[in-house]
Amino acid sequence: MNLHEYQAKELFARRGLPVPKGYVCRSAGEAEKATTELGGDLWVAKCQVHAGGRGKSGGVKLCNNPQDVSAFAEQWLGKNLVTYQTDLQGQPVHHILVEAATDIAQELYLGAVIDRSSSRVVFMASTEGGVEIEKVAEKTPHLIHKVTIDPLTGPQPFQGRELAFQLGLTGKKVSQFSQIFMNLAKLFLECDLALLEINPLVITKKEELICLDAKLTVDGNALYRQPELRQIHDVTQEDAREAHAAQFELNYVALEGNIGCMVNGAGLAMGTMDMVKLYGAEPANFLDVGGGATKERVTEAFKIILSDEKVKAILVNIFGGIVRCDLIADGIIAAVAEVGMQIPVVVRLEGNNAKPGAKKLSDSGLNIIAANSLTHAAKQIAAAVKEK
């Protein structure tokens, strides 16, 4: 679950981290009023969306008069911002963050992720702030410095100082950086984060460190113990189908093809999509109904797939282990009957109660194409689409 920049900065401020003073605005009038509250003669207006690359797409603007701030808000509020990290529709802008401009002397990068290979939180810092860290890692990896957090001892001040020295910081900037590091590490652990990025972490001409930008991603599997963060989740930034699927514990990701896929198990789902592509078709989605699929969830999965107008056929591939194939068959029959399916449906059932499940589908009288293997199913679905 992603947070907006302004939400991340509110969490930062509560923990004593240095952030620019700013106001979240929902109208052009509020944006102009924010300049009066902030004072000064230079402000930064930022569209709040769950995507990077805002600046290159016109979603961030440096303004030298209140009218420019107001015009920027008028231009973007209620519109969609398209960046290299969004799809072609972009993401809706409902908030504008207006901040006093910062007098920047140097830009740094500071971030943290969970390193799967070591099962530890790893902090990364670089002098190459303000640019995409992926490009730095590709072209100049020696400029990225890392420290690993031991889960038993937690973050240590010496680790913050170590990073500061590697960045070439001196004097009071070392202690400032170390304190920021410690507070961020505690935030990462307390809020069950999966990703934290400050890009850039700037040094002002007065030698003060400020978190100029903020990006936080919360581990979705830990939201049950983060009720406060769950409440501020902005579902408008997600694909509507994906958000709806999450309510039914379905793992759904929209894609660009026209073959709807419903599978149990993430690995099998990816393998199914590969087979669909191998035989000349394109998957419209990734959808994992999970090991505890019920008739109701299967019915809902069909509805979600069919809400995509691009879908011309549906492939159901179920390997029954925990899940029973006959229950999946009940869900398929109920969904086809309820929705009034007008497109081809290819079903492959294997494993737990596969034969009773196949018999239910056969006896239903519905136009469902049976497949006896994944290869057969992929060929059938590709042929069905070509015939339409």
Swiss-Prot record:
Regions crossing the membrane: none
BP terms from Gene Ontology: succinyl-CoA metabolic process; tricarboxylic acid cycle
Matches recorded under Gene3D superfamilies: ATP-grasp fold, A domain, ATP-grasp fold, B domain, Succinyl-CoA synthetase domains
Binding-site list for Mg(2+): N199, D213
SUPFAM superfamilies: Glutathione synthetase ATP-binding domain-like (SSF56059), Succinyl-CoA synthetase domains (SSF52210)
Top EC group: ligase
UniProt KW keywords: ATP-binding, Ligase, Magnesium, Metal-binding, Nucleotide-binding, Tricarboxylic acid cycle
Pathway where this protein functions: Carbohydrate metabolism; tricarboxylic acid cycle; succinate from succinyl-CoA (ligase route): step 1/1
InterPro entries for the chain: ATP-grasp, ATP-grasp_succ-CoA_synth-type, ATP_grasp_subdomain_1, Succ-CoA_synthase_bsu_CS, SUCC_ACL_C, Succ_CoA_ligase-like_bsu, Succinyl-CoA_synth-like
Cellular-component GO terms for this entry: cytosol; succinate-CoA ligase complex
EC number: 6.2.1.5
SUBUNIT field: Heterotetramer of two alpha and two beta subunits.
Functional description taken from the UniProt entry: Succinyl-CoA synthetase functions in the citric acid cycle (TCA), coupling the hydrolysis of succinyl-CoA to the synthesis of either ATP or GTP and thus represents the only step of substrate-level phosphorylation in the TCA. The beta subunit provides nucleotide specificity of the enzyme and binds the substrate succinate, while the binding sites for coenzyme A and phosphate are found in the alpha subunit.
Name this protein carries in UniProt: Succinate--CoA ligase [ADP-forming] subunit beta
Organism, scientific name: Hamiltonella defensa subsp. Acyrthosiphon pisum (strain 5AT)
